């Protein structure tokens, strides 16, 4: 039996390079790359896409849409790491742990859209609570996140690392027009009735995200407690190898969250911090924006689509 052919369109960008690194030594697939002189040639790209079993698109949004338009072979399956198709109804959202049975949906999908880095944390925290009826659909959600500068792509990495840390701003809050491209994705896949207010920032470190969502218990259905929110998340992700929920007792000893704690992994760590006296809760997610927030998630979805036993069991 021949090995499945995987082609990465855009393997010189931040995410593409990471995916290539994760796949290059695999013996259960054939990884196809184009020579440097051909990797931007539309005709050669189209040929490589149509000759592949699974094409992984690591491109800007417009180029990703163009690449999908190249497809003439109906057998070609696609994982799109851009944000071009994340709210499209005919694409499967590539977050295996999001709802029960979703890993199998991904495994059989023709078109999978990889989640954005920030939505990975936000949807991971909010979707189970909304689905369980603990978080009303019309709750006024506010999200704050700090990412390593690699979240800005290869240009941001090159700019920061050529200037050096000594001259870098320690924190850059951006998206001040409150129109970040991830907002519609978060709203849709978290099941929210209204746009969340999202404030992102880049820190002066390469990779890793801390994302937080404050919750006022008085705005939730009567009787919902911080303990109930935690129990919901713990139950939802029980058995998920790539998502862990910090035991509630352990959060009382945590004084800070390190955005780099899970760098190099494909893991997502969720925590619930409770101030029962004042009726306030802080939901928090820590993960690698280049791991579970990008390349790691793409490889996890690829493994599901290829039927890799360990991936199916883990999800």
Swiss-Prot record:
Active-site residues are 117
* SUPFAM superfamilies for the chain: Glyceraldehyde-3-phosphate dehydrogenase-like, C-terminal domain (SSF55347), NAD(P)-binding Rossmann-fold domains (SSF51735)
**So which domain of life are we looking at?**
Bacteria
Q: Which residues form a coiled coil?
A: none
| Disulfide feature | none
Its chief place of residence is: cytoplasm
Which SMART domains does the annotation name?
Answer: Semialdhyde_dh (SM00859)
Q: Which GO terms describe its biological process?
A: L-arginine biosynthetic process
What broad taxonomic lineage does this protein's source fall under?
Bacteria, Pseudomonadati, Pseudomonadota, Betaproteobacteria, Burkholderiales
> Can you tell me which family this protein belongs to?
Belongs to the NAGSA dehydrogenase family. Type 2 subfamily.
As for subcellular location, the record says: Cytoplasm
> What broad class of enzyme is this?
oxidoreductase
Molecular-function annotations in GO: N-acetyl-gamma-glutamyl-phosphate reductase activity; NAD binding
Designated name of the protein = N-acetyl-gamma-glutamyl-phosphate reductase
The record's catalysed reaction(s) read:
N-acetyl-L-glutamate 5-semialdehyde + phosphate + NADP(+) = N-acetyl-L-glutamyl 5-phosphate + NADPH + H(+)
Q: Describe its function.
A: Catalyzes the NADPH-dependent reduction of N-acetyl-5-glutamyl phosphate to yield N-acetyl-L-glutamate 5-semialdehyde.
């Amino acid at each position: 039996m021949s090995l499945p052919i995987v082609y990465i369109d855009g393997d010189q960008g931040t995410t593409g390079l990471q995916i290539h690194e994760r796949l290059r030594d695999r013996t259960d697939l054939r990884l196809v790359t184009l020579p440097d002189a051909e990797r931007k040639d539309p005709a050669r790209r189209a040929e490589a896409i149509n000759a592949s079993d699974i094409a992984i698109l690591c491109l800007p949004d417009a180029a990703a849409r163009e690449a999908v338009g190249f497809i003439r072979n109906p057998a070609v399956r696609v994982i799109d790491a851009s944000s071009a198709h994340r709210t499209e109804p005919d694409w499967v959202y590539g977050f295996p742990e999001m709802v029960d049975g979703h890993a199998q949906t991904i495994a059989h999908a023709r078109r999978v859209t990889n989640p954005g880095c920030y939505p990975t944390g936000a949807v991971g925290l909010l979707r189970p609570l909304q689905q369980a009826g603990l978080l009303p659909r019309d709750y006024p959600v506010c999200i704050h996140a700090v990412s390593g500068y690699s979240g800005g792509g290869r240009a941001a990495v090159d700019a920061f690392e050529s200037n050096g840390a000594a001259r870098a701003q320690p924190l850059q809050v951006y998206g001040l027009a409150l129109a970040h491209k991830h907002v519609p994705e978060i709203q849709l896949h978290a099941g929210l009735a209204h746009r969340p207010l999202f404030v992102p920032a880049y820190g002066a470190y390469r990779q890793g995200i801390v994302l937080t969502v404050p919750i006022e218990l008085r705005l939730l259905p009567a009787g919902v407690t911080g303990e109930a929110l935690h129990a919901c998340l713990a139950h939802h992700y029980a058995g998920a190898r790539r998502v862990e929920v910090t035991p509630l007792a352990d959060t009382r000893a945590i004084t800070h969250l390190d955005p780099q704690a899970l760098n190099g992994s494909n893991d997502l760590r969720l925590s619930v911090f409770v101030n029962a006296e004042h009726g306030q809760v802080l939901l928090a997610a820590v993960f690698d924006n280049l791991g579970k927030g990008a390349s790691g998630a793409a490889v996890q979805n690829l493994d599901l689509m290829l039927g890799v036993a360990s991936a199916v069991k883990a999800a």
